[in-house]
Amino acid sequence: MRNMSFMITPDQIRAKTKTVTRRMGWKNLKPGTLLQPVVKGQGLKKGEQVEKIGGPIRVLSVDRVILNQITPQDVYREGFPQMTQREFVTMFKKSHRGCRAGSAVNRIQFEYAEEA
């Protein structure tokens, strides 16, 4: 099972309030795939270990979407109910080098596998 990092949203994953994630990569991901959420998957210092966040998640869908076309509902599903669409896009761009508001990203919808 592959790991997927949720470094920005570990609390939302722990609380199971996040059901959608946008990624620059992961374009070959298929519905039904099980993934293990982790806090950080890359850039670990010597001696650091991957920290799992709960149990696995199951991918429900993967769609190519334009970042700045995010809906208020998806901002909520991303785990940021307090943010506006513009605030989410700004935050996403800052955390993903080279990403622009009009960039195509992968929208991954998932469920928590132990509840499925």
Protein language model regions, located:
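Structured alpha/beta reader/binder surfaces that contact nucleic acids or chromatin modification marks
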Residues: 1-116
